[in-house]
Amino acid sequence: MISKLSVNPTFSPSYNIIVDSVLDFSHILEYVTNKQVLVVTNTTVAKLYLTKFLAALVDDLDVRTCILEDGEQYKSQQSLDKILSTLLENHFTRNSTVLVALGGGVIGDITGFAAAIYQRGIDFIQIPTTLLSQVDSSVGGKTAINHQLGKNMIGAFYQPKVVYTSIEFYKTLPQREYIAGMAEVVKYAFISKDFYLWLDSNRDKILAKDSVTLIEMVKRSCQIKAQVVAMDEKELTGARAILNFGHTFGHAIEKCQNYRGLKHGEAVGVGMAQAIDFSHYLGLISQQQAKDFKDFIVSFGISIDFPNDICQKEFLEAMLLDKKNSNKELKFILIENIGSLSLQKQSKNELEQFLDISR
């Protein structure tokens, strides 16, 4: 069973997302014909899927691999340099090269950024192997590496040629990674009331990993993101900002833990709860709404407990570095109801007061 949808960005060529019930890498062959191919993956995914992927490629391709360490802390300049050096050492040229990102969000982000900057832009293909990367980071063209002072601070908007993925990857995906991915899925439920209702009615099947339901879940998640990206690919109008619900708080959590604590999806889960509480603090939603929204998050196995190893001062400083901020104004994606999120400006003092009473 295959589900296919199209992403139509504002400024970039359209491309397809292919969601498969089985794992058939032959779907990407048309995109690598007569190409030099560099497969970028990590040590974990390489052991599971690299051999199968390489076996699916035709014999006359010039194929190289670049295997990075696994973890958010390796989404770094050093890892980027390793990819670029591999390209240069093997004389990969702009018009004949395609990068393949075989892995989760870290691999997709860093490979996409390498593709964006190598010789001013080369083709790349996304093969996301985690739920989170399937529904979020592989779609929409955001590519980046982290800096010691902040997450995703060095990057570019750069779209892939195609996204191919399969729910078969879940067979080797740790449960913690699956639940982390569900946080990004639940985020879309707050953006779309129809999806909120669909998730609510299919919760048991999702948690049981029913194949047909999961394909539909991934497809619907990608459709929501694709619709937003089509309106505001490069975050010029503010429409795309709603995709960052939970991320202002979440990114600060990751930064404070040096990207070695909560996984990205876990941090987003906590971040959404923080954004919900902040919305209640500001009078945008009632106490009962805040409880209901947080209960919905938790019902999918997602923890919303704030880490106890983060001090408020450090957390506040990390939030001040958020990319949405401008002219010393803090910007947050806040919620007024299911399907009603908005980008709002708040003062540093307002945030400090909220943090004082919420700890």
Swiss-Prot record:
Pfam families: DHQ_synthase (PF01761), DHQS_C (PF24621). Binds 1 divalent metal cation per subunit. Can use either Co(2+) or Zn(2+). InterPro entries: Dehydroquinate_synthase, DHQ_synth_AroB, DHQ_synth_fam, DHQS/DOIS_N, DHQS_C. Its EC number is 4.2.3.4. It is found in: Cytoplasm. Its cofactor is Co(2+); Zn(2+); NAD(+). NAD(+) binds at residues 70-75, 105-109, 129-130, 142, 151, 169-172. Zn(2+) binds at E184, H247, H264. Gene3D superfamilies: 3.40.50.1970, Dehydroquinate synthase-like - alpha domain. GO terms for cellular component: cytoplasm. One of its GO terms (biological process) is aromatic amino acid family biosynthetic process. The keyword NAD applies. Pathway: Metabolic intermediate biosynthesis; chorismate biosynthesis; chorismate from D-erythrose 4-phosphate and phosphoenolpyruvate: step 2/7. It catalyses: 7-phospho-2-dehydro-3-deoxy-D-arabino-heptonate = 3-dehydroquinate + phosphate. PANTHER family: 3-DEHYDROQUINATE SYNTHASE, 3-DEHYDROQUINATE SYNTHASE, CHLOROPLASTIC. HAMAP family: DHQ_synthase (MF_00110). This is 3-dehydroquinate synthase. The lineage of its organism: Bacteria, Pseudomonadati, Pseudomonadota, Gammaproteobacteria, Thiotrichales.
